[in-house]
Amino acid sequence: MKKPLILLAMVVALMILPFFINHGGEFGGSDGEAESQIQVVAPDYQPWFQPLYEPASGEIESLLFTLQGSLGAAVIFYILGYARGRQRRDDRV
């Protein structure tokens, strides 16, 4: 009974700790950080292509990113569940 509580406390600590370590810091995406570094290294750099769709706001962009991740997770876990069910069925025969 102690082990699950210790693991739960560790997970909660890992979730809360970043807020205290970087208090007042700004959270930004890796794309924006990469873009700023490219501008420092090569100010005359021109992108090879433009995005097919540019979301109207950051909230819509976050929504699309979340939907993409959720769909990917659903596909992966469906495949894992299907494979496990198939393996159990084959083990019974």
Curated annotation (Swiss-Prot):
Keywords: Cell inner membrane, Cell membrane, Cobalamin biosynthesis, Cobalt, Cobalt transport, Ion transport, Membrane, Transmembrane, Transmembrane helix, Transport. GO terms for cellular component: plasma membrane. The keyword Transport applies. The chain crosses the membrane at residues 5-25, 63-83. One of its GO terms (molecular function) is cobalt ion transmembrane transporter activity. GO terms for biological process: cobalamin biosynthetic process. It is found in: Cell inner membrane. Pathway: Cofactor biosynthesis; adenosylcobalamin biosynthesis. It comes from the Bacteria. The keyword rRNA processing does not apply. It is a multi-pass membrane protein. Its main location: membrane. InterPro entries: CbiN. Forms an energy-coupling factor (ECF) transporter complex composed of an ATP-binding protein (A component, CbiO), a transmembrane protein (T component, CbiQ) and 2 possible substrate-capture proteins (S components, CbiM and CbiN) of unknown stoichimetry. PANTHER family: COBALT TRANSPORT PROTEIN CBIN (PTHR38662:SF1). HAMAP family: CbiN. Part of the energy-coupling factor (ECF) transporter complex CbiMNOQ involved in cobalt import. Belongs to the CbiN family. This is Cobalt transport protein CbiN. It comes from Klebsiella pneumoniae (strain 342).
